[in-house]
Amino acid sequence: MGIFTFEDESTTTVAPARLYKALVKDADTIIPKAVEAIQSVEIVEGNGGPGTIKKLTLIEGGETKYVLHKIEAIDEANLGYNYSIVGGIGLPDTIEKISFETKLFEGANGGSIGKVTIKIETKGDAQPNEEEGKAAKARGDAFFKAIENYLIGHPEY
C-alpha cells in the first residue's frame, strides 16, 4: 500500500460559520444545488455523525457514477470535518480510500480560510500517482468554489 499526502488551502469572502453550515450541517441539500455534477446525497448507513456513510451520485464524463463518503469526525466547535471516500464507481480501482481532514479558519475581512490535508491510499503494490493527486486537488478546488458561489448568490442562506 502506498500513501500520497498533500495539503491545500482556499480562501473565500464567506464567513467561516456560514460556510461550515453549508459544507457540513446542510451538505445533503446544499451540495446538489451548488455543485452541478452532484445529483444527490443520501445517507445509506448511520445517523449523520461519525461512522455515517453517504452515497453521492454524480455525473462525470456523461456517465452516472457514485462514491461512498464516510464521516470520520465532526468538530463543530473548531469548524473541523474529516471524511473518506471509501468506495463506489467513482473511486479508481487502484485506490483503497481517499481521506480528507478539513478545517475552516477566520480569514481577512470576515471571510474564511479552508485548509485540507488529503491522503490517497492505494491498494496492494499500486503506487500513488501524481496525476491522481492533481485530479483530486482540481475536484476539491472546483467543489469549494461551487459552494462559495452558491452562498454568495444566496445571501438569505
Swiss-Prot record:
The keyword Metal-binding applies. It comes from Lupinus luteus. Keywords: Allergen, Calcium, Cytoplasm, Hydrolase, Metal-binding, Nuclease, Pathogenesis-related protein, Plant defense. Trans-zeatin 1 binds at residues 8, 83. It holds the Pfam family Bet_v_1. GO terms for molecular function: abscisic acid binding; calcium ion binding; cytokinin binding; melatonin binding; protein phosphatase inhibitor activity; RNA nuclease activity; signaling receptor activity. One of its GO terms (biological process) is defense response. Ca(2+) binds at residues 32, 35, 38. Trans-zeatin 3 binds at residues 69, 81. Trans-zeatin 2 binds at residue 60. GO terms for cellular component: cytosol; nucleus. It is found in: Cytoplasm, Cytosol. Belongs to the BetVI family. The gene is PR10.2F. This is Class 10 plant pathogenesis-related protein 2F. Class II ribonuclease (RNase). Binds to cytokinins. Interacts with melatonin.
